[in-house]
Amino acid sequence: MASSLGDNFNLLSPQQRELVKMLLDNGQDHLFRDWPNPGVDDDEKKAFFDQLVLLDSSYPGGLVAYINNAKRLLADSKAGNNPFDGFTPSVPTGETLKFGDENFNKYEEAGVREARRAAFVLVAGGLGERLGYNGIKVALPAETTTGTCFLQHYIESILALQEASSEGEGQTHIPFVIMTSDDTHGRTLDLLESNSYFGMQPTQVTLLKQEKVACLEDNDARLALDPQNRYRVQTKPHGHGDVHSLLHSSGILKVWYNAGLKWVLFFQDTNGLLFKAIPSALGVSSTKQYHVNSLAVPRKAKEAIGGITRLTHSDGRSMVINVEYNQLDPLLRASGYPDGDVNSETGYSPFPGNINQLILELGPYIEELAKTGGAIQEFVNPKYKDASKTSFKSSTRLECMMQDYPKTLPPSSRVGFTVMETWFAYAPVKNNAEDAAKVPKGNPYHSATSGEMAIYRANSLILKKAGFQVADPVLQVINGQEVEVWPRITWKPKWGLTFSLVKSKVSGNCSISQRSTLAIKGRKIFIENLSVDGALIVDAVDDAEVNVSGSVQNNGWALEPVDYKDSSEPEVLRIRGFKFNKVEQVEKKYSEPGKFDFKA
């Protein structure tokens, strides 16, 4: 049985012996071929078996399931099988919201009430290398007016929801899970600990580390050995779909369910606008009783973003899932839509754009994971050497995506979507300056530059809707990207969590010029008859109520260009292409409780 191992078989624990037998039965004898006798490299061999046990324990169904899934998917890939064969696409049902109207406000209010029964899950396994940034992505500043990093912004948003949803109810603590990877785990923990968890109780936060999966060297799904080390299987990330199996195996979902929670919200690591959209989307989930609610944005036909689509199979099965943009057009053409993916009379595709933020109802989610063990339908993307598809240029692996969770759901599941305007909900930071500068004009840059400018734009438009006179933006080319530069307006989530909250804090005749900066750092800051031409920062503790009025006029903060190649500047500034020269500002700080008036 263990012939290729020879006497090395005796080095193994009973658990390892079982695993090795299973591997040998599944065509993996090459792993142990030509091993030296016991006494040579024993420590390396033991480390190898420990690695195999880890790979086995961290995959639903173990390594044998991984190998069998790989054989099936690799055979489909070689044969050119289309996963959508037999499926007909149609437009799913969902809710389209318009910021600030009565319907939107109603959903926002419902979502805030519901937040006390929610848990949040951040998928944060990535580093910022693709952005030209050497750290973890969640440590990047979302904007540089205040320097607030993404993780701080997310935590402060959850805390603001926690507080708002507790009004009139008992105090609650909203749980927050962060999925990390080997690359990000230690640094994420350091970021939290060195900043006192940004105001959260450490017990509210759980880090779940994702393991990698084995690489595959050929169509027979033989596990690939590390070219530099015969006692190590080569591994690569499995994708963010692992979040489901991690939540399942950790037991945390049952804890939440027993504590009376009802919703799990999943989000990704660098979208500075996301929490503006969450209250209303959660309100849609609770009002419509969706088991799965995908947040979406209007999508232009053929735009490079997946479309949310209902797929109905000839055998009667149906599902509502994300279909990647390069698959959606051919699928539509093959299904009686001769023009494929085209814009409707609204000017947008009827298939909304998936932004990878999901709201799941906890009860049905637990039931589904009990059936699947948290496994998500996978795919494989081998790079073949030639058209024969018999060998790979380099090893491949199976991958899975968080948003493919609905693929296994029964037809009775209520799967919907909520469409929000892009300016309000979606500004991811994922492209470096060079790549963003190559994006065709009119398409989104999705860079640190555009991500920061999108925050100022959204805040400006929200204040405008609340009655502020906000000057029009100017167009400027920064890091090779033409962006709208609005007044640099920022506020803490607890100040303006919802539109109705913003409206309650702004009154009279208020205005701000395009070159201005306004940073609101406090909960009870009320703005009345204020005009800003320059820079104004108001910082107040929670129990300080501050009324701000009058006319602020100073030289302000100048926006100065930074060349992304200029190594004398910090990376966080180089990747966005600008910095603020803080020439002059009015800064008011209130560190004691009480009522205060600031008249400029």
Curated annotation (Swiss-Prot):
Its cofactor is Mg(2+); Mn(2+). Its EC number is 2.7.7.64. InterPro entries: Nucleotide-diphossugar_trans, UDP-sugar_pyrophosphorylase, UDPGP_fam. It is an enzyme of class 2 (transferase). Optimum temperature is 45 degrees Celsius. May function as the terminal enzyme of the myo-inositol oxidation (MIO) pathway. May also play a role in the salvage pathway for synthesis of nucleotide sugars. This is UDP-sugar pyrophospharylase. It comes from Pisum sativum (Garden pea).
